[in-house]
Regions:
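Single conserved hydrophobic/aromatic residue that forms the stacking wall/gate
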Residues: 1-10, 14
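A short core secondary-structure module
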Residues: 38-84
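A structural signal for short hydrophobic beta-strand segments in well-ordered beta-sheet cores
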Residues: 26-29
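Glycine-rich beta->alpha junctions and the first turn(s) of the following alpha-helix
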Residues: 83-182, 264, 280
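Hydrophobic, small-residue-rich alpha-helical packing segments that form membrane-like cores
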Residues: 18-20, 35
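C-terminal helix-coil-helix/basic helical segment that borders enzyme active sites and/or dimer interfaces
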Residues: 158, 180-244
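Glycine-rich phosphate/cofactor-binding loops in nucleotide/flavin-utilizing enzymes
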Residues: 119-135, 228-285
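A generic structural signal for well-ordered coil/turn residues at beta-strand boundaries
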Residues: 22-24, 49-51, 65-68, 77, ...
Length: 285
């Protein structure tokens, strides 16, 4: 089963702290040969399948909030851990939910599960997030856009094609230009990494543009399928429910994809935060 990593989609959000990660309250008390962890983290992706989980925890109270945070690897089978599913608007089937809240109550974590040095978790998390945010987007976005083009060339029940709608195709063309520009940026960053440099603030740029383009593509997909996206009644298989989907697989999943991808501009640091990072580190504001 997968090891769940703090640098993945929704692991950076702690209960009641939202995107203000430095204010996290999940604590790890030093008990000699182990830490005693209490607190919660939320929007944890696939926690129900994980054997291990990486957590940022507060090991000391400091004047500067970013200090006193440490990086722990915690066994998900430990006593005191409870995983509660979060039902989301994309209406995934029972037992197939994506995100969870993980609660820690007096969870014992061996000292050897500390990653790096105590109190330097913030530094490690920022480094990992650079690579998560700078993840390559263009290849997948190209595929999604090509799928839209293909579907747009199919006649609807009235004999019309969206590929003949100038407004729809203009929206497609604008997104393709943006993806081309992003691919060029990704290739430049790969060159920098090969030269031994870090990703830097460009990762915030890629995360912002990549997720917003992805959201725009899901919006066009819903527009393309029209009323086939409305029923939104058959998200997947459930025990005892075998009603066939209405419309094609693409049409049947357009609305769930649209709702699910609303999260993309929030996870790994909201896009508003990414713009603040770019303003500070790139523009010096």
């Amino acid at each position: 089963r997968p090891t769940h990593n703090v640098s993945s989609a929704a692991s950076d959000v702690y209960k009641r702290q939202g995107s203000d990660l430095a204010s996290l309250k999940t604590k790890a008390e030093d008990k000699g040969d182990h830490y005693l962890v209490n607190g919660a983290k939320t929007w944890t992706t696939m926690a129900q399948h994980a054997d291990m989980i990486f957590c940022l925890v507060r090991t000391s109270q400091e004047d500067i909030r970013q200090k006193g945070i440490s990086f722990l690897l915690i066994d998900m089978h430990s006593d005191g851990i409870e995983v509660q599913p979060i039902n989301t608007l994309d209406n995934t089937p029972i037992g197939h939910h994506e995100v969870n809240t993980v609660f820690f109550e007096d969870v014992k974590v061996p000292k050897e599960n500390l990653i790096g040095e105590e109190g330097k978790g913030w530094t490690y998390a920022k480094y990992l997030l650079e690579f998560e945010r700078g993840n390559g987007y263009s290849s997948e976005l190209y595929q999604q856009l090509q799928q839209l083009k293909t579907k747009a060339s199919i006649e609807d029940i009235g004999g019309n094609k969206l590929s003949e709608d100038p407004n729809f195709m203009e929206a497609i063309a604008k997104l393709e230009v943006q993806i081309n520009a992003m691919e060029a940026t990704e290739l430049r960053i790969l060159g920098s990494l090969a030269a031994g440099q870090n990703v830097g603030p460009e990762s915030s740029l890629l995360k912002t543009r990549g997720t917003e383009i992805g959201q725009a593509i899901t919006e066009l997909a819903v527009e393309l399928v029209g009323y086939y996206g409305i029923p939104f009644h058959n998200p997947g298989p459930e025990i005892g429910i075998n009603e066939p989907a209405r419309g094609s697989k693409f049409a049947n999943t357009a609305a769930p994809r649209y709702f699910n991808y609303r999260k993309a501009s929030i996870y790994a640091g909201s896009n508003e935060i990414q713009r603040n990072i770019m303003a500070k580190l790139v523009l010096g504001l």
